[in-house]
């Protein structure tokens, strides 16, 4: 595939994402979580509100010491960020007028519920000529229904539409 074509396609997707940003569904709040909001004045969270920052295994920033790492009290699993922390970062970005960055944090928050292996499968499926439109739409439905990842599902549906327009689906090459 020609690099100019790839660059053009990426620019088109980004342009459409920017134009749809106001229409994109907001990330669903975490089940049982709080919908705390943060402002620019709360940044950086680690300094101003360390009590707000917890890992997926409920560890706090104070738990991350060299001693705890060396004694295996802190593992790689403990390093995973939570959707709540990502949503706080998104609200800070929105407050700062950085809507595109906020959208990225919200998408990342949704993806914390998706297993790593599934994310890699989706990544590969989104590469040009790897999937049919139906396969991409099935991925979008899966993201929305199984993982409540509405923003990511909309992104995959948009990609499916662009791939139809640009003839980048499986069998088009």
UniProtKB/Swiss-Prot annotation:
Keywords: Bacterial microcompartment, Cobalamin, Cobalt, Lyase. Its cofactor is adenosylcob(III)alamin. Its EC number is 4.2.1.28. The keyword Lyase applies. GO terms for biological process: propanediol catabolic process. The propanediol dehydratase enzyme is a heterotrimeric complex composed of a large (PduC), a medium (PduD) and a small (PduE) subunit. Belongs to the diol/glycerol dehydratase small subunit family. This is Propanediol dehydratase small subunit. It comes from Salmonella typhimurium (strain LT2 / SGSC1412 / ATCC 700720). The gene is pduE.
């Amino acid at each position: 595939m020609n690099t100019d074509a790839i660059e053009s396609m990426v620019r088109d997707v980004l342009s459409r994402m920017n134009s749809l940003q106001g229409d994109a569904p907001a990330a669903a709040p975490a089940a049982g979580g709080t919908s705390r909001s943060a402002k620019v004045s709360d940044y950086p969270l680690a300094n101003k509100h360390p009590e707000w920052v917890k890992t997926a295994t409920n560890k706090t920033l104070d738990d991350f010491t060299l001693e705890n790492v060396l004694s295996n009290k802190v593992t790689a699993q403990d390093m995973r960020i939570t959707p709540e922390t990502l949503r706080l970062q998104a609200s800070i970005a929105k407050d700062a007028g950085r809507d595109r960055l906020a959208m990225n944090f919200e998408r990342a928050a949704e993806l914390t519920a998706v297993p790593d292996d599934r994310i890699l499968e989706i990544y590969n499926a989104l590469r040009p000529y790897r999937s049919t439109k139906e396969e991409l739409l099935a991925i979008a439905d899966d993201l929305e229904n199984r993982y409540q990842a509405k923003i990511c599902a909309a992104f995959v549906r948009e990609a499916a539409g662009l791939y139809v327009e640009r003839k980048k689906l499986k069998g088009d090459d």
